[in-house]
Amino acid sequence: MENFPTEYFLNTSVRLLEYIRYRDSNYTREERIENLHYAYNKAAHHFAQPRQQQLLKVDPKRLQASLQTIVGMVVYSWAKVSKECMADLSIHYTYTLVLDDSSDDPYPAMMNYFNDLQAGREQAHPWWALVNEHFPNVLRHFGPFCSLNLIRSTLDFFEGCWIEQYNFGGFPGSHDYPQFLRRMNGLGHCVGASLWPKEQFDERGLFLEITSAIAQMENWMVWVNDLMSFYKEFDDERDQISLVKNYVVSDEITLHEALEKLTQDTLHSSKQMVAVFSEKDPQVMDTIECFMHGYVTWHLCDHRYRLNEIYEKVKGQKTEDAEKFCKFYEQAANVGAVSPSEWAYPPIAQLANIRTKDVKDLKDVKDLKEIQKPLLSSIELVE
């Protein structure tokens, strides 16, 4: 295994942050914690329901970690949407992370997907059954065009996760494969479209700006994620099917050349994002800029990405890139380093246990299916 290219990573990260003019001022600390807890609380109650617990079959610790990660991503990045929209998006994107971490073969449950869809029957695949049940709560925030993007991109994501289960990096010479798979499983159009709730944006009046933003966000969001994930995935055997490593196989190039390819694409996309929208509708530009800055803050502060290890390693070094990286990291930590103990409570497992006890206490239940129905509408917040 090669040594991690720390100096190269520092230089790339610094250039990215400079290009997007990173300065996350999306929230005060109190506002950040308030939004985190609001979104978490609603989502935790959603996933604690008996139906979700029964169909998802996810280890409680993993589900808890997944929800905390996603709530952080949504609250930090979707800084301009309502708290209710943040909560509903947090539920939706937690479902996607659960699927991404799954190793179950989807083939048997997808045999009659379209026939069931056309007939209005519940999907055989449990993930689709739950996602479809929650989708109206997400789509109520958006107009028809953005909603269509959310639906289509989620469908693409499912297919991308299906492909990833084969751990296939592409055939040598298949240069289109890495980007094909990354666009499929990147949720870029879902993310890009979910920035524009109808209560804040006139979808028809800003149709061209929104369409362009979705197009630009598709690559920017996934490439930044791939770049910021490169350290944690570098020597992790479970993360060997990544865009960079697929470039190595399909393009028949070295790891350094593949990283350089990703770097140049990410920096170019960042320049485009700023240049294209700087002269457009101010509210559109503000939303995009807040997303970019919050998205970077989330990556720098979320322990899933382990970038604190890079910071500790280079802190005190006198190189220009090390000093700039540390300054950016500290800037992000000052606004975004919030302990989950301040907002991620109560735990999902605790809520699920309470619900299980309540169900067991029900008397004279004539139909077992009744107790499998959601006890809480996912559009209600439980304080």
From Swiss-Prot:
GO terms for molecular function: trichodiene synthase activity. Its EC number is 4.2.3.6. It comes from the Eukaryota. Signal peptide: none annotated. One of its GO terms (biological process) is sesquiterpenoid biosynthetic process. The gene is TRI5. The keyword Lyase applies. TS is a member of the terpene cyclase group of enzymes. It catalyzes the isomerization and cyclization of farnesyl pyro-phosphate to form trichodiene, the first cyclic intermediate in the biosynthetic pathway for trichothecenes. It serves to branch trichothecene biosynthesis from the isoprenoid pathway. Pfam families: TRI5. Belongs to the trichodiene synthase family. Pathway: Sesquiterpene biosynthesis; trichothecene biosynthesis. It comes from Gibberella pulicaris. It catalyses: (2E,6E)-farnesyl diphosphate = trichodiene + diphosphate. It is an enzyme of class 4 (lyase). Trichothecenes are sesquiterpenoid toxins that act by inhibiting protein biosynthesis. This is Trichodiene synthase. InterPro entries: Isoprenoid_synthase_dom_sf (IPR008949), TRI5_ascomyc (IPR010458), Trichodiene_synth (IPR024652). Keywords: Lyase.
